[in-house]
Amino acid sequence: LEVVEFILYMLWDMGLKVGHATRDVDDCISQAKADMTIRTAMLEARFLTGDEELFTKFRKKFAGKILSGSARNFVKAKLDERDLRHKRSGESRYLVEPNVKEGKGGLRDLNTLFWIAKYCYAVDTLDELVSCGFLSREELNLFKRCDNFLWAVRCHLHFLTGRAEERLGFDNQSAMAEAMGFKSTSGLNKVERFMRQYFLIAKDVGDLTRIFCARLEAEQTKPGRMARLPALFQRQKQVHGFTISGQRLTMVRSDVFRRNPVNLIRMFKIANDYKLLIDPNTLREVTRSRHLIDKDLRENPEANKLFLEILTSRNHPERILRRMNEAGVLGKLLPDFGRIVAMMQFNMYHHYTADEHLLRAIGILSELERGELEDDHPLAHRLMSQNINRKVIYLAVLLHDIAKGRPEDHSLAGARIARRLGPRLGLTKNETELVAWLVEFHLVMSDTAQRRDLTDPQTIEDFVSNVQTLERLRHLLVLTVVDIRAVGPGVWNGWKGQLLRELYFEAEALLVGSASHANRPLRVANAQKEFLDVLQMNMPDWSEAKCNKYIARHHDAYWLSYDIDTKIKHAALLSSVEDSGFQIEVTEDKKQDVLELNFTCPDHPGLFSRLSGACAVAGLTIVDAKLAITKDGMALDVLRLQEPERENFPDKARVKRLIATIQSVLHGEILPPDRLADVPFSRRVNAFKLVNNVMIDNDVSSHSTVVEVSGLDRPGLLYALAKTLFNLNVTIVSARAVTFGERAVDVFYVQDLTGEKITRKSKLTAIMDGLQMVLANQSKPRRVEQSKQAKSSKSAKQAKQGIKAA
């Protein structure tokens, strides 16, 4: 015991985590019976030194009292433990920040395989697994290759971080790729090549665990001999060289695939049609027979017909496509799909590898069609059930990102693949062209909805000139919804859904001819009438004269830019602003996952930059801003806000702090640069290097110059950009803010001080240079210097006096 104590203290002093216990043999047996974790640890007991006779006694007693007759329970417990572990660490083995130890396809999955084999077959080494028939020689080599790679990754990760870090996060992936010798190539950088190798290994681990755990589960959970008697009288159905027995599909002959390679596709079709599991030995034969999928089979009409039926199945096509992918069949049948298997994109926006994203998108499309997502997507569900070509939409979803990782634009390359693949799968020329168009322009609806002012007629006209037909519009809406939802948890929200629906209905109206400049006065008049009808119900004390006077305060564009509820809020705010100088109202919209902030006060330069600074100080992100000014100079700003991580909805205390912060910023009591200097940067964001970009366009809006800025996100970025525009005497008419992981895209609709587009070249150059300087400054916002603080306080005092004067 003294020796053990000395060794333990030495190991602890070295900072190592060491589990320990002192027990006699009977204690060991008692503990192993009661606790599966302790049982597993004792399963791997090895003799180091000391009384070997005592160790032999323990091994014999452990085998007789613990191992004997309990294999079925152990297998079930380990498989249940595996499933729970996967649920905790992420259900997919293709998460772009995987857990090397506990994640799906990680080291613990290999441990589980060995523990089960050791328990059931009494082996001590990996090589013994071949002699006992648990592994083939090829599978043993694969096991060792996976084990060596994952241990190398884990050791490098621990050395790099200086701690027992198991998650392979973005902030470590670049250094890991460098340490393990990966180099960049055209289309893929070194990080993406390293992570692709990781995911291919994780896929191999998945192949091993799926086949062998299924085999063991089948063996160890077999009922007793008498219980099996009724099964002898069950009829086994044979279909195209396969046997359906119970819930399993099994090949009748081992040469079923060599005799007819089309059976490699047909087998998955049968499994999907009858909702069957595939026998592990049959799956093993599939893996061995993948080389039979050659050019002739890919051009085979029957094979392509079977695949299209699988893809468009109403019976959960994602499940069977996932099995085809895991077996390596999907990538062989569609070589372009094979190129993106296990491919990640080194960014924080995409949560999964490219192939996993496409398979999840197919699953979401199927759920949408079955009505399981109708509450979240009523429009997309209606279109899917009434107006959509199923072959077109399912193929477009499968192909929309199939050309990722190439030097060229993946949308253009994907469209070429679609034009080549459509006829092969039996689509008509028109269907193929529609699929190709959807793949080429699959981002246009999302980009327009999230980055453009949808109340600007020019935005809708430009979008419609691209879409051209209702058929394209309907299919594009469904594809866009599915694509965004499949990116990962928390990416979709109700606000994005509202924007997409708004764009769809505006475009639909223009396509069918019910919206045009000619009937704009009529639309304004109808909107004003609707407002008066609702206003009289909400504010019956308003006289007719007061109503007419209020309507006259607004420009025509106002009546077409806001929904009726917002207009009523504005009426209440403007009627009470005279008493307090300014009014703020914050309402929750949990369906759209946003806080809506309505604010009014006398307009003055820099108002939006102050509001955006206050929101940043309060820890909230502006995702949309509509800024209006009445004819008599009152600002009406509508901001939609979200939590940066989108995991929690802001509580009432947070809302109160937001309002108090806005008041303090407007009164000059809080200076945003001071507060934002203390906001910590995310280490994960700092792992990325982005090319900053400022785009200025005078053609995409009918009334404003559009400035689009993209770069690495950081706290207070929108405030810094808005502040720069204010300093350049630029008026912000409206703004959009979108975040794609680490990349922020902020869009401003701006005018000069006379309310016109900015066309002077020197001014445009100054805007470009000023915004580029903001993007280039990746440091935290600096605290305001004494002289500047005095100047800012003076400006805030003038603004405060303006508010009081109102």
Language model feature labels by segment:
Residues 1-3, 8-13, 131, 143-152, ...:
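Divalent metal-dependent catalytic cores for phosphoryl transfer on phosphate-bearing substrates
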Residues 2-350, 419:
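Non-catalytic interface/linker regions that flank or bridge core catalytic/transmembrane domains
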Residues 8, 104-107, 111, 144-150, ...:
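Generic structural concept
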Residues 12-20, 29-32, 291-311, 366, ...:
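Conserved catalytic alpha/beta cores of large enzymes that bind or transform nucleotide phosphates
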Residues 48, 52, 61-72, 96, ...:
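Hydrophobic alpha-helical scaffolding
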Residues 149-150, 182, 188-249, 317-319, ...:
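Regulatory modules associated with amino-acid/nitrogen control
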Residues 230-250, 326-346, 352-397, 402, ...:
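Active-site-adjacent "gating/activation" loops or surface patches in catalytic cores
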